[in-house]
Amino acid sequence: MFPLSSHHRLLAGSRLCLRVALTALACCGVLHAGSMRFESAGTYVSNDTYYLDAFARVDLGMEPIQALVNGVELHFLVRLAVYKTRRWWIDTPILERRLRYRLDYYELTQHYRVTDAQTGKSANFRSVAAALRELGSLSRYALLPAHEINKRRQYVASIQLELDVTRLPGPLMAQAIRSSEWQLETEEFRWSLN
């Protein structure tokens, strides 16, 4: 067996320290089950386009964070919709969209990466808290052209965020589907578009 280099010993030591810290926090009750909730969402018109700004507070909890630092990619799904409200019938959707994001941890450089699956753009963060703030933020997202909205009708927009457990590796997915720690999603957040 080959001796470990100082770099490999440092990485192994930092991984062990992280696991010990997570276990200690869990035993003390400091770490709790994760949660997600939208704190704000709204639309505005600029240059004949409706834009969306939204912010969700995302707290993963212990099991998803442990999986993340052990190399498991976490996938998130944002559901957007705009409905034309109807007084005596079901609201009619005029826009339904799904946005996908991925969160990775890179042990060698000890950073977290958030990737937008639609554009391929990514951003790196030194802490999981900073990466989760980015995941929960949607800023100046072009929703739909203003001419598609009839000013004499009422419209409602909605947004929802969830941790997509169907994208986890097989054995972990089977466990996650049964575990409440992995069932993370926001309530549907609705607001009047006009």
Predicted regions and their residues:
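Structured domain cores in non-transmembrane regions
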Residues: 64-129
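N-terminal secretory signal peptides that target proteins for export/translocation
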Residues: 1-13
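Bacterial N-terminal signal peptides
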Residues: 14-29
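Short structured motifs
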Residues: 36-42, 62, 98-100, 140-145
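Glycine-rich, aromatic-bearing surface loops/beta-hairpins
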Residues: 143-194
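A short, structured loop/turn motif at beta-sheet edges
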Residues: 45-50, 106-109, 147-156
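N-terminal onset of structured domains
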Residues: 34-74
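A beta-strand/beta-hairpin structural motif
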Residues: 53-56, 107, 130-145
